[in-house]
Design a protein with these regions (language model features):
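Membrane-interface amphipathic/re-entrant loop segments adjacent to transmembrane helices
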Residues: 194-202, 295, 329, 497, ...
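Membrane-interface helix/helix-cap signal primarily in integral membrane proteins
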Residues: 2-12, 70-334, 697-704, 710, ...
Length: 953
C-alpha cells in the first residue's frame, strides 16, 4: 500500500479577493482629495499588480471605488470658518482676555500635568458662539475636580484661531486640529484663567473619573493613602474611601472663583504630536504646598506609578517630558499607546471567566467549544476597555479585528449544526485587517490622515508579513523540536520547556523588529529620527503583558469593588516593573547615551516602494518561486525606491540659489542653499517651551527631507533664545564644518558679565563634537561657491555686540546683493552700519528684529532698495509684529511685505539656468538672476488684519 505523501504547506499570504482590492482603491481615492499624486500612484500600483483590473467590468468597478473614495474625501474636508464673531475680532485686536463659557465634549491628560479640554458652543453669555470647537490646555490645575464631558465651563481666556507651522514637506498641527473640528485654542495655567465648572457630567465620564481617582488613591504611598495593613478596620476603609473620592455633588457644585491674576500669554506656536505648548512661567504652582492627603482630585504620581494610569485610562497627566523622551528613545512609546497588545489582557480575562464557567457548568463545553466562549466573552471586556481607555484609534482597530474574528469564527457555534458550515466562511488575516480598515474609514474618512492609525495598521501588517518567515527560520533552526519527541522519550520535558521559552523570546524579538521595520518609513517621515534600542522590548513587553497589565486590571477591579487595601497591594506590585523600567532607562541615558539618531526623511515614493517589496517577499514563503504579482511588486518597489535618490541628484546639480525663511513661530531661521549640495543655517529659531524643540521638531524635519543630516556651517546672528535655541539640536546631531558667531559676552570677552546659559550650552556642544567656532566681524567673507559668498557687514572689528545687536550678513553673487540678513539689530546699530558706507543693496531684505519698530530705520530701506521684504514673525504674536510703522514705511516705498506667520515658509529662488551651459554657472559676465518668490500657503488675510491701525510698536 503506497504511503500517503504529506500535504505541502499552504503559503500564508494568499492573493487578495477583488473586494479587498476595491477597499484599497477606495482608501486611496479618499487620500486623493488631499495628496493626489501619491494616492494615484498607489492606485496605479494596485491596478498593475492585480490583473483582474484589466477586465472591463472589474476596471469599471475599480474606477468607481476610486471615484467614490475621492468624492467622500472631498466632502469630508473640514470647512475652516472664514468669518469670526465680533467679540473675537475685538479680542484678537486688543490681545485681551474675554470671559467665555462652553460645553465640555472631551478631555484627556497630557504629560507634564496638562489637561486638554475640548469645548463646544464657546462664547460670551448671550453672544454668538465660535464657529467650531476650541481646545483649552490647562497646566498645573489646582486641587479641584477635573472638568468632565457634559459639564459647562466658564473662564477668562485669550482665544486665537488654531495655527500651526507651515513648512514645505513637514507635518502641520493645524490640519490635525481641523480634522477634529477644532478651529480655536487657548491656554491656562493654575488658576490664572479663573476657570469654573458647573453642571453634572455624563454618567460614563463621571464613572470613569471615579475609577481613575480610586486607582490614584491606591497608588499613593502607604503613609499617604492609609494602606498600612492588609486588614484595615471598617472605619479606616471608609475614611480612605472618602479621601480618595469626591463627594456626590462635587462636580455639580462649582467651587468659588479663585483669585484673578495676570493671564498667561499664548505660546508663539503649537506643535503636532506634541500638539499644544504652554509658555513657561516663573514661580511654583499655587497648590504645591498643599498636604498630600488634601489633594484629592489632582493626585499626581511620580515615577513608574504614573505609567499605570496611562495604561488603564490613556491618561498621561502624571508623566513628565524627560521620562517620555527616554521611553521614546528606547523604542517603547508604542507600549503606552493602547492597542492590541493591551487588549490581550482582555483575552486573559476571558480565559479566566471561561475556566470559571467550566468549573460551574462543564457540560456546556459539550455543546459549545471553549475557544468560542473565550472569544465571545472577550467582546464585552474589550468594549469596557474601549470605554475605559477613551477609545484611541489603535485600540479601536484592535477591538474591531477582535469583533470580526469572533463574528466569523465564534458566533456560528451558537447556531444549530446545519447552519454552522454555511455561516463559518474561511478567512485570512488580510480579510480581518481590511474589514477593520473599512469600518474605521466609513465611520471617519479623515482617520486615514491620523498618524496613530497609520502606525497601528502598519505595525500589525508588518507582524503578519514577517511571522511566517520567523516560524520558518525557527523550524529550520537547531532549536526546533516536535512535541511527539517528548511523548516518545526522545526529548526531555525540561529541554522542551526551555525550547518553548526560547521560541517565545524569538517570536517576541522578531515581532518587535517586524513592527519597527514596518513603521520605520512612517516614523522617519513624521519625525526624522529613529532608535537602535528596540531590543529593550524583549525585556519590557513580556513584563508588561504578563505582570503589569494583569495586576493593574486586578487592582482596578479591586478598587472599583471598594477593596482599597487589595487594590493598593496589586497596583504597587504592578508598579515594580514600571519603576524598574524608568530607573533602567535613566541609567542607560547616563552611561550609554540613550539617544535617537537623526536620519534622512524618505520621499513618499520610498514608503510605497518599501511596502511593495515587503509584500512581495512575504509572498515567496512556502512557494518555489515568486508568483507573477510578487515579481511586479518587486519591480514597482525598486522603481519607487529609486525616485528619492534621483531627485536628490537632480537637486544637487540644479543651478539655483535659494533663501528659505522657515516658519518657526516668533523666531527666525534662515536656510541658504546653493548648487552642488551646499547648505547653511543662519539662526535656528526657538520657543519658550522645553517640550517642543524648534530645532528638533521643525528645522531638522526641513533639513532631512530626502536629504542627509549635513550642513556646511551654521551661523548665529546673536544668542537670543528665538535665534539660538533651535540650533542646539542641529549642532549636536548634524555633520558640519564650522560654526560662526559674533564675539559672545562672557565667553570671548571674559571681562563682561557671566555668559548666557544658551551661549554656554552652544559652545559646549561644539567643543564636545570638535566643531570649530569662529568669531566674525565686518570685512570677513564666507565663500560658498565660485562667485557666491556671504559677506559680514557688522559688528565692527574689536566690538562685542550686546543685546539684540550681532552679525549682519549680505548674500552676494558676483558683487550683486541677493539678500540682507540683519538679525535683530536695533536702530542705533543699523544707523552705524549706514554710516560705515558699506554696500547694502539686495533683492531681499529680511526685516531686522522681526519687523519691530525699535529697528525701524527708513534710510535702511532706501539703501537696500529690496524687491521684497520678509518678516519672520508668528501669527497672532503678543508683540504685534511686524509693527504698523514698519508696514507703513514699506508700503510707502512700494516694497511688498511677506510674513511667515501669515504665509508659512517663504522661499526666494535665483535661477541660474542661463549660465548652465558654461563651465562655471556662477561666473561673472552674465546679468544677475531675478528672484522668484515661492509661498507655502496663500496669505492669511485674517492674521494680516489682526494688528490694529493704531498700533505703534
Amino acid at each position: 500500500m503506497p504511503t500517503k505523501q504529506p500535504m505541502p504547506p499552504v503559503p500564508p499570504l494568499q492573493p487578495l479577493l477583488f473586494w479587498e482590492t476595491g477597499v484599497l482603491l477606495f482608501v486611496a481615492g479618499i487620500v486623493t482629495a488631499r495628496f493626489p499624486v501619491p494616492a494615484l500612484t498607489a492606485c496605479a500600483l494596485f491596478a498593475w499588480v492585480d490583473s483582474r483590473t484589466r477586465r472591463p467590468l472589474c476596471c469599471l468597478l475599480a474606477a468607481a471605488c476610486v471615484i467614490a473614495g475621492w468624492w467622500i474625501g472631498e466632502k469630508s474636508v473640514p470647512r475652516v470658518p472664514q468669518e469670526y464673531p465680533a467679540w473675537l475680532e475685538k479680542s484678537l485686536s486688543s490681545r485681551r482676555a474675554v470671559t467665555v463659557e462652553g460645553v465640555i465634549v472631551g478631555s484627556r491628560g497630557l504629560p507634564d500635568q496638562r489637561l486638554q479640554i475640548i469645548l463646544d458652543d464657546v462664547g460670551p453669555a448671550e453672544k454668538e458662539p465660535l464657529p467650531g470647537r476650541m481646545a483649552l490646555t490647562w497646566q498645573d490645575m489646582p486641587d479641584v475636580p477635573r472638568p468632565l464631558p457634559g459639564q459647562r465651563i466658564t473662564a477668562d481666556l485669550k482665544i486665537r484661531p488654531v495655527h500651526g507651522f507651515h513648512n514645505q514637506g513637514t507635518w502641520n498641527s493645524e490640519a490635525y486640529w481641523h480634522r477634529q473640528g477644532v478651529f480655536f485654542q487657548a491656554w491656562a495655567k493654575q488658576d490664572d484663567a479663573a476657570i469654573r465648572t458647573s453642571g453634572t457630567p455624563s454618567a460614563g465620564a463621571e464613572l470613569r473619573e471615579r475609577l481613575r481617582l480610586r486607582v490614584a488613591a491606591a497608588l499613593d504611598p502607604p503613609e499617604e493613602s492609609g494602606l498600612r495593613t492588609l486588614s484595615p478596620s471598617s472605619t479606616d476603609r471608609n475614611a480612605s474611601r472618602q479621601a480618595a473620592l469626591p463627594s456626590q455633588n462635587a462636580w455639580s457644585e462649582p467651587p468659588s472663583p479663585p483669585r484673578r491674576e495676570k493671564l498667561p500669554s499664548a505660546p508663539e506656536q503649537i506643535g503636532e504630536v506634541q500638539t499644544e505648548e504652554v509658555r513657561e512661567h516663573s514661580g511654583s504652582p499655587a497648590h504645591s504646598a498643599a498636604p498630600a492627603d488634601t489633594r484629592r482630585f489632582s493626585r499626581v504620581q511620580d515615577g513608574g506609578a504614573s505609567i499605570i494610569p496611562a495604561l488603564l485610562f490613556g491618561d498621561r497627566y502624571g508623566l513628565n517630558t524627560p521620562d517620555m523622551e527616554r521611553i521614546n528613545a528606547a523604542g517603547l512609546t508604542h507600549s503606552l499607546a493602547l492597542s492590541g497588545q493591551h487588549l490581550a489582557v482582555v483575552g486573559l480575562g476571558a480565559l479566566a471567566l471561561t475556566g470559571i464557567v467550566g468549573l460551574l457548568a462543564p457540560g456546556l463545553f459539550l455543546r459549545f467549544p471553549a475557544y468560542s466562549l473565550i472569544g465571545l466573552l472577550s467582546l464585552p471586556l474589550a468594549s469596557a476597555y474601549l470605554w475605559l481607555g477613551d477609545a484611541p484609534p489603535s485600540l479601536v482597530r484592535a477591538a474591531l479585528m477582535l469583533a470580526i474574528v469572533c463574528l466569523l469564527r465564534c458566533v456560528p457555534d451558537l447556531l444549530p449544526e446545519r447552519f454552522r458550515r454555511n455561516l463559518r466562511p474561511a478567512f485570512t488575516f488580510a480579510d480581518v485587517l481590511l474589514l477593520a480598515l473599512l469600518c474605521m474609514v466609513l465611520a471617519d474618512p479623515l482617520c486615514l490622515y491620523d498618524l496613530g492609525v497609520q502606525l497601528s495598521f502598519s505595525a500589525v501588517a508588518g507582524i503578519a508579513l514577517c511571522s511566517p518567515w520567523l516560524s520558518k527560520l525557527w523550524n529550520d533552526g537547531p532549536l526546533s523540536f516536535s512535541p511527539l519527541k517528548v511523548l516518545q522519550g526522545g526529548l526531555s520535558p525540561m529541554r522542551a520547556a526551555g525550547g518553548r521559552f526560547i521560541r517565545l523570546l524569538w517570536l517576541t524579538l522578531g515581532c518587535s523588529v517586524a513592527a519597527q521595520l514596518a513603521t520605520l518609513p512612517l516614523v522617519l517621515d513624521a519625525f526624522g529620527r529613529s532608535t537602535l534600542w528596540f531590543p529593550i522590548n524583549l525585556l519590557w513587553l513580556p513584563a508588561l503583558g504578563f505582570i503589569v497589565l494583569p495586576l493593574s486590571f486586578l487592582g482596578l477591579i479591586a478598587a472599583a469593588a471598594g477593596l482599597e487595601q487589595a487594590a493598593g497591594f496589586l497596583l504597587h506590585l504592578a508598579n515594580i516593573p514600571c519603576e524598574a523600567l524608568l530607573h533602567s532607562l535613566r541609567w542607560l541615558q547616563a552611561h550609554a547615551g540613550l539617544d535617537l539618531f537623526v536620519s534622512p526623511r524618505p520621499h513618499w515614493t520610498a514608503i510605497l516602494g518599501f511596502g511593495a517589496i515587503a509584500v512581495a517577499l512575504a509572498m515567496r514563503i512556502h512557494r518555489d518561486h515568486f508568483p507573477h504579482a510578487a515579481k511586479r511588486l518587486l519591480i514597482s518597489g525598486a522603481l519607487l525606491l529609486s525616485v528619492g535618490p534621483l531627485l536628490w541628484v537632480h537637486a544637487f546639480f540644479e543651478p539655483k540659489i535659494s533663501l528659505r525663511v522657515l516658519d518657526v513661530g516668533q523666531g527666525q531661521a534662515v536656510l541658504l542653499e546653493w548648487p552642488y549640495g551646499g547648505r547653511a543655517m543662519v539662526d535656528g529659531g526657538g520657543l519658550f517651551s522645553d517640550r517642543f524643540d524648534v530645532g528638533r521638531d521643525l528645522v531638522s524635519l526641513v533639513l532631512t527631507a530626502n536629504n542627509l543630516p549635513r550642513l556646511d556651517f551654521i551661523a548665529v546672528t546673536h544668542p537670543d533664545r528665538d535665534h539660538l535655541k533651535g540650533l542646539l539640536f542641529i549642532a549636536a546631531n548634524y555633520a558640519m564644518k564650522a560654526a560662526y558667531t559674533a564675539p559672545l559676552e562672557g565667553i570671548d570677552t571674559p571681562q563682561h558679565d557671566s555668559p548666557r546659559p544658551l551661549s554656554e550650552a552652544f559652545t559646549a556642544i561644539l567643543a564636545s563634537r570638535g566643531i570649530p567656532r569662529h568669531t566674525l566681524g565686518a570685512g570677513n567673507v564666507l565663500p560658498l561657491a565660485d562667485g557666491l559668498a556671504l559677506e559680514v557687514l557688522a559688528p565692527a572689528p574689536g566690538v562685542t555686540p550686546s543685546g539684540n545687536d550681532g552679525l549682519v550678513f549680505r548674500l552676494v553673487l558676483n558683487g550683486h546683493g541677493l539678500a540682507l540678513l540683519p538679525g535683530d539689530a536695533e536702530a542705533p546699530y543699523l544707523r552705524a552700519l549706514l554710516r560705515s558706507g558699506a554696500d547694502l543693496s539686495a533683492d531681499v531684505l529680511v526685516l531686522p528684529h522681526h519687523g519691530s519698530a525699535g529697528s525701524l530705520v527708513p534710510a535702511l530701506y532706501d539703501a537696500v532698495s529690496p524687491k521684497l521684504a520678509i518678516a519672520s514673525a508668528g501669527a497672532y504674536n503678543p508683540y504685534r509684529l511686524p509693527s504698523r510703522k514698519v508696514r507703513d514705511a514699506l508700503e510707502w516705498r512700494d516694497i511688498p511685505l511677506h510674513i511667515t506667520g501669515n504665509e508659512g515658509e517663504i522661499a526666494v529662488h535665483w535661477d541660474l539656468k542661463k549660465n548652465a551651459g558654461k563651465k562655471n554657472i556662477l561666473q561673472e559676465g552674465f546679468p544677475p538672476p531675478r528672484p522668484h518668490l515661492s509661498q507655502y500657503v496663500q496669505p492669511m488675510g485674517r492674521a494680516r488684519e489682526s494688528s490694529p491701525a493704531g498700533n505703534t510698536e
